A protein has these predicted regions:
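Extracellular/luminal Protease-associated
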Residues: 243, 276-283, 504, 722-770
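Segments forming glycine/polar-rich beta-alpha architectures that bind adenosine-containing cofactors
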Residues: 597-668
Length: 865
């Protein structure tokens, strides 16, 4: 921590760093023009940056330059159990590698406070119609995840600076919003803005509090944990003015789905957005958090709101200590982070969105930005006539209706609205269709408390929306098994079946293998679709049922009134609910425990936790990038779900066959996500998504075949993807992937990069990369290359029979040459952009990846190498 510009913070016993003065010393009047994001980035530079580099770094912010890397030091790391556990498995493996080289493994610890929340591993096996669902699902979770939880329990005592929130307590982002973020930190006698990275792409949810909080891959999180600065260049900072107010009956879900479509079209990929204006002022933190949560769905890095009266009200509502709330207000007003101080901020680009334009909305059938106003569902071909045969499910059957996800369960207005629509439906005798698997999985225990306080929990339970978990569940693809009779009918009749959920992602195949497509909706709409029973139902016009007098009941007859929603929220949501939930939860993590052995005792038969191989053989050092054959040629919009799916493992998959050989019963296969601590299981998930289109595999008419398929070259044999990977691994064949635009969008899972790296992929050439996945590729020693504008796999007529090599001096964003050697003997040289974006990334790449770099640097510092 530096000493220059450190001053007493008026009205407190703390100091602060006077960022305004530091900026004004370089350019008078500049601070008032800085956006909110730049002010926070500047503060941490003044506090932590090497004093000799400070002026040049601050000039990047003042002059809006992007030609110099500067450090970012996040105050905290938050992890969920999948990527967090994977990161800690990597650190445990790093300890083994250090010990093998003669270093002290006990010295490998996170130096930045790290919070791990177990929220991703519970599947909804018992539905919300089962009164014992919560207990049953938790028992199954514990049984299936014994190996994982054994390891996680070891980390509590083996590593310093790691807090673990055990399963059954809520979702990482909602806990971060409601409790973990102080908004303003106070450590070592200094107050400064809270900042955070998290191993999940929805980490920006806390941006709603004015906290820069961004999603990163597990590899980058490990780097931050170990105290390394995250090097960055000034991002694009885009102002988004929200005008008007939401119309009556419109939810924050409707708003965010409309905004997601709008921002996707405006191409804000990688940008930091700052929302302001009368519309932003009118939104509660619950509404703001819904927008910030879906940052990755519109491709941005952050979605900031300023600290204002709404922020203070929320901190009080969620039971923060009075002293902490006062500190947030004092600090924000004194340092120019209060909303009123941002009226002079200048943006290089400003977008405007009118909240009054928002209608009731679904998103689907395959993307969160596929915005569908409910008034136009018939026009869009989603709603339409269907035949209802006695005893059979209809076309478009809604087999899953899930109130799920921190995106929506963190907003009391949404949850109360769901309770009220259930109450109104129950009064009129409406019921859930029998084929609909319904569930309620709040991101916080407080949700159940205030629904009970409002007498709405029993209303939801009557319709089958009992609490199944306090975890991610269906939103994360952990929707659990269907009733076997329903699953068999879907197969036998080849039925088009769907899911409706209040989640944030609906990529094909994500929610359930039998839900061919999925739609995102507000919690009250999810309840309505459970009653309707099919996506073919025109939700605004068709009759949901008939009242006791035989009158048709439509959506407008049961939709709750805004005034009643607000009155119930005001009366039923109380600070003591948050305190009674979180004080005991965090007290558990603070109890002192005896230190564990610094080296983990790996279980050799485990299919969940295994010593990683990243410090061995070909995983170390820079790749040659010669003689590479394509593993796949891929279209636009390849997601990390395509690259490494998260949903249930089926027996006929490569991972399922492996687990069967290892003696795991099929009912305990669990999800792909839960096995990511074992590379032998997880690497078999690479490209295992049945919705994949590999353009190297075509039918006799030349049409691309769907499935986890590959073509082994040079013999041209079509196989399942894993068999192709195994074949190439045996041959020690270096591989390349050719792809379209927006490669790697979606979840921040590092296994989307680890899987291809272990398969032998040395480079990926695409028209564009999503930010987190590109960083993960670098972290695994895989070279990301970008075609120049106008060049694509189509213009180059790439068919997969080629071999490739890359030539040129590797440096940040350098132009390199991709040489294609065609099967007919011809060659073609193509300029490509090296997407190692910083000098630090070049250094990591040349070491073979971030984990290999850690080991090198640690041993050098210890003198053991």
């Amino acid at each position: 921590m530096n000493t220059n510009y450190r001053k007493p913070l008026p009205g407190t016993s703390l100091d602060y760093f006077d960022t305004r003065q530091a900026i004004e010393d370089i350019q008078p009047g500049a601070y008032a023009k800085l956006p909110y994001t730049s002010r926070i980035l500047a503060e941490q530079l003044v506090r932590r940056c090497d004093p000799q580099a400070l002026t040049d770094s601050l000039k990047q912010l003042i002059e809006r330059k992007r030609d110099l890397d500067f450090p970012w030091y996040p105050a905290r790391v938050v992890c969920h159990d999948i990527l967090g556990q994977t990161a800690l498995v990597d650190l445990a493996g790093l300890r083994d590698a250090i010990a093998k080289k003669g270093g002290d493994p006990a010295k490998v610890n996170p130096v930045v406070p790290t919070q791990l929340i177990v929220d991703h591993s519970l599947a909804v096996e018992a539905p919300g119609s089962d009164p014992d669902a919560f207990e049953k699902n938790r028992a199954i979770e514990d049984r299936r995840n014994d190996d994982r939880f054994h390891f996680i329990n070891w980390t509590k005592t083996a590593f310093e600076n790691v807090d673990v929130i055990p399963p059954g307590n809520g979702i990482m982002h909602q806990i971060n919003l409601e409790k973990m973020s102080p908004v303003v930190q106070s450590r070592e006698g200094v107050a400064y803005p809270d900042t955070c990275v998290g191993t999940d792409s929805h980490t920006p949810m806390v941006d709603a509090l004015g906290v820069i909080s961004v999603g990163v891959g597990g590899l980058e999180a490990e780097s931050v944990m170990l105290g390394r600065a995250s090097m960055m260049r000034l991002p694009d900072i885009v102002g988004v003015e929200l005008t008007g107010k939401l119309q009556p009956g419109i939810t924050s879900t409707d708003m965010v789905l409309a905004i997601t479509e709008f921002l996707r079209k405006e191409r804000v990929v990688g940008a930091y957005l700052e929302f302001y204006g009368e519309g932003a002022d009118s939104l509660t933190v619950g509404d703001r958090a819904t927008i910030s949560n879906m940052t990755p769905e519109y491709g941005a890095t952050a979605a900031m709101f300023f600290i204002d009266g709404q922020t203070i009200d929320y901190l009080k509502l969620t039971g923060r200590e009075d002293d902490q709330v006062a500190l947030v207000e004092t600090y924000a007003k004194h340092t120019g982070l209060w909303a009123d101080s941002l009226k002079t901020a200048e943006y290089e680009r400003v977008l405007t969105f009118d909240l009054t334009s928002v209608e009731r909305t679904l998103a689907g059938p395959s993307n969160p930005h596929a915005h569908q106003p409910t008034s136009e569902l018939a026009k869009a071909g989603i709603a339409g006539p269907w035949e209802q045969e006695e005893g059979l499910m209809p076309d478009g059957a809604c087999i899953i209706a899930a109130i799920t996800s921190c995106t929506n369960t963190s907003n009391p207005r949404n949850m109360v609205a769901a309770g009220l629509i259930a109450r109104n439906a129950n009064k009129l005798g409406l019921t859930r269709k029998p084929w609909v698997k319904s569930s309620l999985a709040p991101g916080s225990k407080t949700v159940k408390m205030y629904l009970e306080e409002a007498n709405l929990m029993t209303e939801l339970e009557k319709l089958g929306f009992g609490v199944v978990a306090f975890a991610c569940t269906t939103c994360n693809g952990m929707s659990g098994a269907l009733d076997p009779k329903i699953a068999q009918e879907i197969i036998d009749r080849d039925l088009y079946s769907t899911a409706v959920l209040s989640g944030n992602r609906n990529f094909d195949g994500r929610i359930h293998p039998h839900a061919k497509q999925a739609f995102l909706a507000s919690p009250p709409l999810v309840v309505a679709y459970a009653i309707a029973g099919t996506i073919r139902f025109d939700i605004e016009k068709d009759a949901l049922g008939y009242d006791p007098d035989g009158n048709p009941v439509t959506l407008k007859d049961i939709w709750p009134d805004d005034a009643e929603i607000d009155a119930i929220v005001k009366a039923s949501v109380k600070p003591e609910q948050f305190r009674s939930t979180y004080i005991p939860m965090f007290d558990v993590t603070k109890k002192e425990q005896a230190k564990s052995n610094p080296l983990y005792d790996w279980r050799p038969q485990s299919t969940y936790i295994r010593r990683p191989p990243y410090w061995e053989g070909g995983m170390v050092g820079e790749k040659l990038l010669k003689g590479m054959r394509p593993l796949a040629v891929l279209p636009d919009n390849i997601t990390t779900d395509h690259l490494s799916p998260s949903n249930a493992i089926l027996m006929d998959s490569a991972s399922g066959e492996y687990l069967h050989k290892m003696g795991v019963p099929e009912e305990d296969f669990n999800s792909y996500a839960t096995h990511r601590g074992d590379h032998l299981t997880a690497q078999r998930a690479t490209f295992a998504n049945p919705k994949l289109f590999n353009e190297m595999v075509r039918d006799e008419n030349g049409k691309v075949k769907q499935g986890s398929l590959a073509r082994i070259e040079p013999e041209g044999k079509v196989t399942r993807m894993w068999e192709a990977i195994e074949t190439y691994m045996e041959r020690k064949q270096p591989l390349i992937i050719i792809a379209g635009a927006d490669y790697g969008q979606g979840s921040s899972r590092d296994w989307a990069a680890k899987g291809v790296a272990l398969a032998g992929v040395e480079a990926i050439v695409a028209e564009g990369f999503e930010r987190i996945h590109r960083t993960n590729l670098v972290g695994m020693g895989v070279m990301p290359l970008q075609f120049q504008d106008g060049t694509t796999r189509h213009t180059l007529t790439i068919d997969g029979t080629e071999t490739f090599e890359v030539e040129g001096a590797v440096s940040p964003r350098a132009e390199l040459t991709l040489t294609m050697h065609r099967a007919n003997g011809e060659s073609e040289r193509v300029p490509v952009i090296c997407r190692l974006d910083t000098a630090e990334e070049v250094s990591i790449y040349k070491a073979g990846g971030v984990l290999q770099r850690f080991a090198q640097d640690f041993l050098e510092s210890e003198g053991a190498a």
